Amino acid sequence: MMADEEEEVKPILQKLQELVDQLYSFRDCYFETHSVEDAGRKQQDVQKEMEKTLQQMEEVVGSVQGKAQVLMLTGKALNVTPDYSPKAEELLSKAVKLEPELVEAWNQLGEVYWKKGDVAAAHTCFSGALTHCRNKVSLQNLSMVLRQLRTDTEDEHSHHVMDSVRQAKLAVQMDVHDGRSWYILGNSYLSLYFSTGQNPKISQQALSAYAQAEKVDRKASSNPDLHLNRATLHKYEESYGEALEGFSRAAALDPAWPEPRQREQQLLEFLDRLTSLLESKGKVKTKKLQSMLGSLRPAHLGPCSDGHYQSASGQKVTLELKPLSTLQPGVNSGAVILGKVVFSLTTEEKVPFTFGLVDSDGPCYAVMVYNIVQSWGVLIGDSVAIPEPNLRLHRIQHKGKDYSFSSVRVETPLLLVVNGKPQGSSSQAVATVASRPQCE
């Protein structure tokens, strides 16, 4: 390009860049100028703003319309909505052909492919952009795409998830004040948590990353996906109050997205049913319950009764049989509980498998079992022993509803002894996390 021509083009590109930046600022900072009640209009308002911006850009472009930078900015403007735009794909494809080093065009084209559902093509764009220039946007996008790539084996998927965490960490390192990088790091930890057997340390890392996203970027608090993903983690961690709050907030921020409202409703229905069954001890008649409890035998403790139980620390310990009512919150080391199943309850997600346990002391506690295969379960009348039980006390208030109950969390069915028998490895499975396939 000649020097004079370059001088002529520069102010035009600058003006186009300003218009596109304003458009994205309108979308990303929508709730700074609108109330949450306007959330249902957001997509419509962004669409109108996009049309207005494209018209203004057309007036500015003039003779430079075929230049790669102009094609990229026009494609980026068209790409502001959550929907796939064939026109954006066409313009951005031309831009990268004309100027292969134009990293922002590769990033935008990758997002277009992502919206189109072509995850492999999106992956190629983001990886390609990084070969030209290491940048946080490509790293962020690569992190989220890696978690969605089709894989043939569980190992391959785990490898992609680990790689996703690495890319997100690199993005954070490039700019610790970028809320999107922290949010995507939180999502990659969320996937890692579900693909590697629910390590509490990883869930803490996910929650910390989400908190950091909100701390460094005020826009993060208006991101419905952040609230839904964090609520999913809270639900799995049995922090039900925080989970309900998160689902409710996500629903308010994106009323057209049905999932948060459904998840909130499902959790409320689960808590309604659970507390009702706990209060009525599964509606088992008093006489029948006495007969069930009268049939409990020391033999039902199985391997928990012979001093050969191996604790989490790997040491052989002798367990002491304790009534449910004497348990303390947290892990009760050196103790074992034994009771009868009076009801069972499954949710839409099938995890956890929840049942009510009663012992001769009287109270009914919920037992939540994680990492189960779908076919696993216990029946009413089964005797269940739980070594070193982990007790949770729940006090939940949400939208005028109050719930209060005690539960025992069991990370795997392998820890349970049912009717005197330990559970085989075929009873254990790994949980997975589902997310909507869109740019984060």
From Swiss-Prot:
TPR repeats lie at residues 7-61, 68-98, 103-130, 136-174, 179-216, 224-253. The record marks R147, D225, E259 as: Mediates interaction with N-terminal MREI motif of beta-tubulin nascent chain. Induction: Induced upon heat-shock stress (at protein level). Phosphorylation by ATM kinase induces nuclear accumulation while interfering with nuclear export, and phosphorylation by CHEK2 kinase enhances nuclear stability. Changing Y210C: In NEDCAFD; uncertain significance. Changing D83A: No change in interaction with N-terminal MREI motif of beta-tubulin nascent chain. The keyword Mitochondrion applies. The modification Phosphoserine is found at S203, S221. GO terms for biological process: cellular response to starvation; DNA damage response; DNA repair; positive regulation of mRNA catabolic process; positive regulation of transcription by RNA polymerase II. Its main location: nucleus. Changing R147A: Loss of interaction with N-terminal MREI motif of beta-tubulin nascent chain. Loss of interaction with 28S rRNA of ribosome-coding tubulin. Loss of tubulin autoregulation and accurate mitosis. It is found in: Nucleus; Cytoplasm; Cytoplasmic vesicle; Mitochondrion matrix. It comes from the Eukaryota. It is linked to Neurodevelopmental disorder with cerebral atrophy and variable facial dysmorphism: An autosomal recessive disorder characterized by global developmental delay apparent from birth, moderate-to-severe intellectual disability, poor or absent speech, and hypotonia. Most patients have variable dysmorphic facial features. Brain imaging shows corpus callosum agenesis, mild ventriculomegaly, simplified gyral pattern, and cerebral atrophy. This is Tetratricopeptide repeat protein 5. It comes from Homo sapiens (Human). The lineage of its organism: Eukaryota, Metazoa, Chordata, Craniata, Vertebrata.
